[in-house]
Amino acid sequence: MSLWHAILIRIPHINMKERDTALDILIDYEKNESYLNITLNHALTHDFSPSERGLITTLVYGTIQNRLYLEYQLEPHIHTRLKVVERMLLLMSLYQHFYLDTPDYAIVNEAVEIIKERRNKRAGGMINAILHSCFKETRSLDDLDHDERLSISTSHPLWMVKMFSAQ
C-alpha cells in the first residue's frame, strides 16, 4: 500500500500529528524510492495549518538533506538491525536534535510514543536508549580526513567530494 492510500485511509479515523506524517513520508521514500516532493505535496493537501505544513516539510527535507551526517552520528549506537520505521524515526529525531530548537525530552517522548503505536513497547525502550546515547555522545568529525569530513558534514557522497576536490 502506498503512502497516499495509507494517508487517505487514516485521515478520517484519527487526527494525524506532524511527526507521524513526516515519518510516513520518509518511510515511503526509503521503501519505495518515491519522489519526495510528490509524496510530500500530496500529504500536505490534507487538513494541516501553515505551521504544521512547515514543520512536516522541514522534518522531511532536513532529514534527507543531512542524512549522511545523521547516519554518522547514529552508527556507533546501533547494535542490531533496525526496521525502516525505526531507522527513519531515529534519523528524523536526530535531525531535530542537531538542527532544530527542539528540547531533547520532547524529541525522545514523541519518538517513543510514535514507535510504541507502530510497533510495541519494547521498540519504544530501544528508541529511548538509542536517542539518549546519541544525545550524550556526539561524534566529532576531526578524526576524519578532509574529504570524509566534507562528505559527512555536507551529506554529499564521498565520490562526489573527491571528484570536486580533484578539480
Pin down the residues of each PLM region.
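Class I Rossmann-like S-adenosyl-L-methionine
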Residues: 3, 7-167
